UniProtKB/Swiss-Prot annotation:
It comes from Methanosarcina acetivorans (strain ATCC 35395 / DSM 2834 / JCM 12185 / C2A). Belongs to the RnfG family. The keyword 4Fe-4S does not apply. The lineage of its organism: Archaea, Methanobacteriati, Methanobacteriota, Stenosarchaea group, Methanomicrobia. This is Ion-translocating oxidoreductase complex subunit G. Signal peptide: none annotated. Part of a membrane-bound complex that couples electron transfer with translocation of ions across the membrane. Catalyzes Na(+) transport, most probably coupled to electron transfer from reduced ferredoxin to methanophenazine and heterodisulfide reductase. Involved in heterodisulfide reduction during methanogenesis from acetate. It comes from the Archaea. Residues 31-188 are extracellular. It is a single-pass membrane protein.
Length: 188
């Protein structure tokens, strides 16, 4: 009898501890998520300024879909100068890389002829190989690069692939072409 009482006592204790831990986790989750969203929005704004520096402001272009919070989903951003003239576009693209999804922001000139730059926002590429898509040396190749030349050198373009990470390099090129095609179809 005493063994079953001991087992019951241990089980009840574990259930109470688990319930308290779950309650604490639930209490901290919501404020943490809100703070995380604010931080991500700030990082995105900084990245947009870097890849389209001639823009004084970014106007969101939304579609008919809404997110989980009921806000319209942003399709892309129009970069405008201080007079309100469109100087380019910034669009988020997701592309499958060698190890997972690569999420990047692409800057495109207002006439859709030039990549103004890009920033990787998230990735799960191999450290020391595919992760080198985040380096200034790789990303610098795309600053003011004509869209027609936005392909790897092995394919006749002007982009040097990262040695040992051709799939990741090609994924970036594909994402940039997808970005240009998408925005030009929406705006053109």
């Amino acid at each position: 009898m005493s063994d079953s009482k001991e087992i019951t006592k241990v089980i009840v204790t574990m259930v109470v501890i688990s319930a308290v831990a779950a309650a604490l986790l639930a209490l901290t989750y919501t404020p943490t998520q809100a703070q995380l969203k604010l931080l991500q929005a700030e990082q995105q704004k900084e990245a947009m300024k870097e890849i389209l520096p001639q823009a004084a402001d970014f106007e969101p272009v939304t579609g008919s879909e809404v997110d989980d919070d009921g806000n319209p989903v942003v399709l892309y951003y129009k970069g405008v100068d201080s007079s309100g003239n469109v100087v380019g576009y910034v669009v988020e693209r997701n592309q499958v890389g060698a190890q997972g999804m690569i999420q990047l922001l692409a800057g495109i000139s207002s006439d859709f002829s030039t990549i103004t730059g890009f920033q990787v926002m998230k990735h799960s590429e191999t450290p020391g190989l595919g992760a080198l898509i985040t380096t200034p040396e790789f990303q610098g190749q795309f600053v003011d690069l004509p869209v027609a030349d936005t392909s790897l050198t092995k394919n006749g373009g002007q982009v040097d692939a990262i040695s040992g990470a051709t799939i990741s390099s090609q994924a970036v090129v594909d994402a940039l072409h997808s970005a240009v095609d998408y925005v030009s179809a929406q705006e053109g």
